[in-house]
UniProtKB/Swiss-Prot annotation:
Assigned keywords, A-Z: Ribonucleoprotein, Ribosomal protein
Pfam assignment, any one: Ribosomal_S16
Protein family according to the UniProt entry: Belongs to the bacterial ribosomal protein bS16 family.
One GO molecular-function entry: structural constituent of ribosome
Superkingdom: Bacteria
Protein name: Small ribosomal subunit protein bS16
Annotated spans, Disordered: 130-153
Length: 153
């Protein structure tokens, strides 16, 4: 059976992501697969590539042919170089580095959210106090007018 390693499209319109799959070469693009060996999401920055290296090595070893896009992904992850025994088996996969400033940014956002909550609650309390004071001010003249007016019987 002629097997290929290729991409299976997932996602929705204008937001596609792919699964790296091993499939019989005669099957449809999104047809039944033999094994899923990874994922590829081009929508993130940088693109997310996750391939099970041991399974990719196995399928390449038994003769599965990668499609052109999968060949490029295998080069980026270093699996193709490892399979061929070439230099640069570590690959050129870019990763998002969290870094030390990421925690500081998260803390700053949380502090800002708490300050915003406090400001909103203070504004609500102030508005409520003003409304109560205005209501009390309206009731006082009405009571005085009622006392001054003679009662008709």
């Amino acid at each position: 059976m002629a097997t290929k390693i290729r991409l299976k499209r997932q996602g929705k319109k204008f937001y596609a992501f792919y699964r790296v799959v091993v499939v019989d070469s005669r099957k449809k693009r999104d047809g039944k697969v033999i094994e899923e060996i990874g994922t590829y999401n081009p929508n993130t920055q940088p693109s997310t590539i996750q391939i099970k290296s041991d399974r990719a090595q196995y399928w390449l070893g038994v003769g599965a042919q990668p499609s052109e896009p999968v060949f490029k992904l295998l080069n980026i992850t270093g699996d193709w170089q490892k399979y061929k025994g070439l230099e640069g088996a570590e690959g050129t996969l870019k990763t998002v580095e969290a870094g030390p400033d990421a925690e500081a940014r998260i803390a700053a956002v949380e502090d800002q959210a708490q300050k915003l909550k406090a400001a909103k609650s203070e504004a609500a309390a102030k508005a409520k106090a003003e409304a109560e004071a205005a209501a009390a001010a309206e009731e006082a003249p009405a009571e005085e007018a009622a006392e001054e007016a003679p009662a008709e019987a």
